[in-house]
Amino acid sequence: MKGWGWLALLLGVLLGTAWARRSQDLHCGACRALVDELEWEIARVDPKKTIQMGSFRINPDGSQSVVEVPYARSEAHLTELLEEVCDRMKEYGEQIDPSTHRKNYVRVVSRNGESSELDLQGIRIDSDISGTLKFACESIVEEYEDELIEFFSREADNVKDKLCSKRTDLCDHALHRSHDEL
């Protein structure tokens, strides 16, 4: 009877470890996809487009303390993007990395809407995957909204690694793999 207890304990530990790995792969993949989508949307904005920021109160001398800032990285634009970005997770599929056996999430619909130019070999595409990825994305946006706005309000190199691995700990490994833009 003692042997069964140890077997049950071992099975519980193994299942818990597998679930934790799956959850971490999911949240890491959602973070990486979120960063890709935000970088894409920011790059699409005309760099000359600005927005007025500051106080709209009139000072005693009749002037206002208003500053023009680039719209692409403004808090207003980033907040707007964060409200919609997770809807794009339906454009991602799941792929198992053959060398690490970890799940990656890759775009399965190109940015121009055509899928004929994509290699979809070995990628699972279904509503369960996109649904769980969207939920993970929404959880990340809710929990790390301030960090996301802070990171994207200024240009930075290697945002995926800095945000997803170092700042939020959603990825347990540095993200040195390429993630081609479509």
From Swiss-Prot:
Annotated signal sequence range: 1-20
Residues modified to Phosphoserine: S115
GN (gene name): Cnpy2
SS bond partners: C28-C171, C31-C164, C86-C137
GO BP annotations listed: negative regulation of gene expression; regulation of low-density lipoprotein particle clearance
Subcellular location(s) of the protein: Endoplasmic reticulum
Job description of the protein: Positive regulator of neurite outgrowth by stabilizing myosin regulatory light chain (MRLC). It prevents MIR-mediated MRLC ubiquitination and its subsequent proteasomal degradation.
Transmembrane segments: none
Family to which this protein belongs: Belongs to the canopy family.
Keywords, sorted A to Z: Disulfide bond, Endoplasmic reticulum, Phosphoprotein, Signal
Organism (species): Mus musculus
Residue numbers covered by motif Prevents secretion from ER: 179-182
Assembly, per entry: Interacts with MYLIP/MIR.
Protein name, UniProt field: Protein canopy homolog 2
Keyword set includes Cell membrane: no
Domain Saposin B-type: 24-175
Pfam families hit by this protein: DUF3456 (PF11938)
GO cellular component, as recorded: endoplasmic reticulum
